[in-house]
Amino acid sequence: EALDLGITRKRLRSGDLTTPFRGVRMLGPIADSALAYRPLLRHGDRFSSITAAGILGAPMPRWAESQLHVTAGAGLTAARMRGVVGHASDGHGFVEVRGLPISHPGQVFLELATLLGVEDLVAIGDHLVLEPRVAEPGRPYLSLDELARVCAAVGRRSIRRARAAQALVRVGAASRRETLMRLRLVDAGLPEPQLDYPVYAMDGTFIGWFDCAYPDARVLV
């Protein structure tokens, strides 16, 4: 059914989706936990950090699945509850994704810079700026320019790490594995590949999409 709706096989294999039953793909436990906690949110509260990234469908490390991050609304104290990592109000607003209030995607990137390494952050950034082949409402979550402007802010914890990761974010990587492959290729001294590259036969027949390509060298990955 998903394929009939235009969802690609690559998207169905993405790491942010789980398989509770054969033939069923759904968002992982982070989004489920947020939905369960939603009735407890106070006016102005928002999901932030790892939880917000999970709601956005970003590829998260396994250890993050058990943490629910909630940032308090203006004038409210940080949430205190077992299983919840409460954060004091920081004056930032929220956006709604899947009916849940979360930090703005650019803010999520900065929040994660205090917890994740550069490679993990790049994978998050690639997800945020991705333009899916099949249009999805609200995607991309932000542009490369918007992410650069967010990271140009000063005086924030781990801003150097955020900027280092932001400089490596590219449009076209649809999974964490694709991000890591690109980074490994560049680390090995190869030039940056073109991402999500369409290939056509000599007669113009479409052959398929490839994760990485070096067209001048006639190399596809």
Task: Describe each PLM feature range.
Residues 1-160:
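Short gly/ser-rich loop at a beta-strand->alpha-helix junction or flexible surface loop bordering the NTP-binding
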Residues 43, 132-221:
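Surface segments flanking catalytic/ligand-binding clefts of nucleic-acid enzymes
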